[in-house]
From Swiss-Prot:
Ranges of Low complexity composition bias in the record: 123-142
Gene Ontology CC, one term: cytoplasm
Species of provenance: Eremothecium gossypii (strain ATCC 10895 / CBS 109.51 / FGSC 9923 / NRRL Y-1056)
Full protein name: Enhancer of mRNA-decapping protein 1
Keyword Cytoplasm appears in the UniProt entry: yes
Gene that specifies this protein: EDC1
Domain of life: Eukaryota
Compartments where located: Cytoplasm
Amino acid sequence: MSSDTMFINSARLLPTENRKVKQLQRPDRKKHTRGSYAAQKQQLPNGEQPNFGHGQKQSRKRGSGRQKGRDGAAGDSANVGLTEDLKQLLSIPSGSAGSESAQKETSAGQPATGAVADRKRSVPAGGPAGKSSSEPASASSAVDGMPGLGFQSAHVPFSSPVVNHPMLAEPAATGPVLSVPFPGHVAGYMPCVNNTRVQYPLQTRNNVPMSQPMSQPMSQPMSQPMSQPMSQPISPYLPQGFQMHPQSFVGLPVAPMYPQYMSAQYQSPKQQSACQMPLRAQPPLIPSITRNALPCVSSANSTAKASVRSKGSPGSEGGSRRSQNWKSSQNVGYAGATFATDQPALSSLPKPSFV
């Protein structure tokens, strides 16, 4: 800023009687003090003061609208309605204590009369109402065997896209090898890795000893429809990563198209619970082929690269010609600029001793 511009600005701002031409200074410097001045209070466009969580007492004194709605009669009624809704949502109907005790008794192996009576009242017609709690339920009521969903399904109809899936109600049986038991995977069963493919008859599944008492109501409904191999239609849905044999629909024995450890993962829940420690899986065949084939390819590539390098070695004439042509073509694009590589006397200097 030049001196004349500063004079014009100061003359326009200063009053005429207090004008000092020799000692020009800005008028705002007089008003400033060396101490810190109080900042102006912020105000929102709607007229309220901003509340960042530190001014609760001040906002109560002013009586802002936000605190009125929170502590007033309207806020109390809204809170009462919310608590009533939560009570209705979380309330357990009458007889739930009996159903919980009945679930504990059935897990211990004792018959329960209160749970049977409650289920007879709550289950609609056509369902397994006449069966006792010790008898296995059908595949449609397989949710009752899940841990944590048994006493709720006795009073509230439980509907879920996972449970009502067609694959859960009608499992597919393909020849001597069974497909995946989906309710077992929904309940949290993990497949046990085994290196032998299971091709036993279907009736021998019931003789496998059980190690977990809670998985019995889940696996019993699945054993009934699977006892007849081709009685139910095969569902078109297949689990992810499951490969179907082309001739398994006819029932012919076919060699496995994938490594054996893949087929052993899809077993019944009883067989999975019976094996305590996962056995060592057989390594797949495809990586072994690639291990044998990769060194040959790499050796061929290395020999080819060596031959190319031998052709273009700097000692031969062809290699020197190519390098000279490449240098000349690279140096053409620069307008008269010289580099150290253009002068061999500078580029081939002896290296210092400390390097």
